Amino acid sequence: LVFKITRVVKEYKGLKPGSGLGFSVILKECLRKTIGHGKVPEILGTEISILYYGLFAWKRPKQSGENVFTAYKKSGYGSIVGGLAFLSLSEVLAFHVLFMQISIVAAWIIFVLNLYGIIFILADFNASRREPTYIKDEKLYINAGIRWKAVVPVKDIKSIELSNESLRGKKILRAMTILSGPNLVIELEKTHRADGPYGIRKNFDKVLLNPDEPRRFRQLIIDTF
């Protein structure tokens, strides 16, 4: 086990410098190289990423540049998440005291599950901050918090339109921040695949996004065609 952990750390240090990739992407790649492909590295990578982003990744992100697009500043996402986390924690503590009078085991199970939910929301927010969507080498790197990640060649984009319409369908990737609606709709020439938590995969041919600068984002995509 110690040998495996040492190999993961070594692989991580080897991939991280100048890669431009986020923590969760590099971590899962290191786990796949060390443990092998399958559910185990996907589950481990997701759980470690949730704990890292939910509890430790609070330093202000340094990402900047004309090809990098955040999706949390203008929507008030941080304030919403902070308020939601505070209210949820207050409710969790209140329910914990109540259930302790009924069943200690049930009280602790409910407490842990609810606390995990709060950590997940915080992790998704921090992942949105530290792993923004960006364009590089004529490819669109879509990062939706801790939930979805996908890479789409710009040449495969059929259209990109300003829209706040929340479309429905099986092949629609909702790459917005939690609690936010879209302001951009991207239609693709063909189906692509997104990677989600715990090894979940999703095929999509439309993407809903909510970058802080939708018009600049759209224009940069058009200029890259």
Residue locations for each model-derived region?
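Conserved beta-hairpin
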Residues: 118-161
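Alpha-helical transmembrane segments of integral membrane proteins
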Residues: 80-87, 107-113, 205
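Beta-strand-rich cores of mature extracytoplasmic or soluble domains
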Residues: 72-77, 184-225
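Juxtamembrane/interface segments at transmembrane-helix termini
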Residues: 2-21, 123-134
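Single-pass alpha-helical transmembrane signal-anchor segments
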Residues: 95, 109-125
